[in-house]
A protein has these predicted regions:
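Hydrophobic (often cysteine-bearing) scaffold residues that line and stabilize catalytic clefts
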Residues: 72, 88, 169, 173-177, ...
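Reverse-transcriptase-like RNA-dependent polymerase core
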Residues: 110-113, 138-163, 172, 176-185, ...
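Glycine/proline-rich, flexible active-site/cofactor-binding loop segments
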Residues: 35-47, 165-195
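Switch/connector loops and helix/strand junctions flanking conserved nucleotide-binding motifs
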Residues: 122, 237-238
Length: 241
């Protein structure tokens, strides 16, 4: 049986070129040349994002095969988690750098921040990525080189009690950068983190917490009392210095 052709996505740490440069659907220079983005259209080689018109950027964004992008990112995340589980931190560092420099991961990060509930809320710079061209341009410009996070925008929303709850809103670029690095941190945490922590974690719910509590409290030597408490305005009052 003949083997199918495969493009080197992020499977190898060493630098490799596309197996068939002419057939590469997106030959565009960005921070890392490790990725050959699988799209549904063939494009000429572009040296910079400034060489692309909004129409060309829109075409590229709308032609992305998101299934392949997710598979590539998930594959590298699995390798990071496996290395973290085995305590191979040198490999974790190498793979983490690959992931944060990967164009696939950048595309996915931009997509996440532009499809969540806060995508229409700008940061201090007043910028939102609403068009396909904006999103593609953002992915091409997402880099750690010279990066400095901008100040947060402070806004308040009214709670059911009538009190105001403060919100600190980062810029779209900062949100995308946070999402990009969370792809690495999430993979490491899934393997090396606290297995009995259930709050604000993907694929875990209150039902998982209930099941663990039942397991802990159903033994003969289990505690007989549970004290529940609430620290008023905990995150606002706690010292961050």
């Amino acid at each position: 049986m003949a083997k199918s052709k495969r493009f080197p996505v992020m499977g190898n740490i060493e630098e490799k070129k596309c197996l068939n440069a002419k057939a590469c659907p997106l030959a565009i220079s960005h921070e890392s040349n490790r990725d050959c983005l699988i799209m549904n259209v063939r494009e000429p080689e572009i040296t910079s994002v400034t060489d692309l018109t909004d129409k060309e950027l829109t075409l590229r964004w709308k032609s992305i095969d998101w299934k392949r992008v997710k598979e590539a990112v998930n594959n590298l995340q699995s390798r990071i988690a496996s290395a973290a589980k085995n305590g191979n931190w040198k490999t974790v560092n190498k793979l983490s750098r690959l992931l944060t420099r990967s164009f696939y991961a950048k595309l996915l990060s931009v997509r996440k921040v532009t499809t969540n509930k806060g995508s229409r809320t700008p940061g201090i710079d007043g910028v939102i990525w609403s068009s396909s061209a904006d999103k593609m341009r953002a992915a091409l410009q997402l880099t750690n080189k010279g990066y400095r996070a901008k100040p947060l925008t402070r806004k308040y929303i009214r709670k059911k009690s009538g009190k105001l709850r403060p919100l600190s809103i980062p810029t779209m670029f900062d949100r995308a950068m946070q999402t990009l690095h969370s792809l690495v941190l999430g993979a490491i945490e899934s393997a090396a983190g606290d297995k009995t922590s259930f709050g604000f974690k993907p694929y875990r719910s209150t039902k998982d917490a209930y099941a663990y509590l039942h397991l802990c409290l159903s033994k003969k030597v289990s505690p007989e009392w549970i004290v529940e408490g609430d620290i008023k305005a905990c995150f606002d009052e706690i010292s961050h210095n």
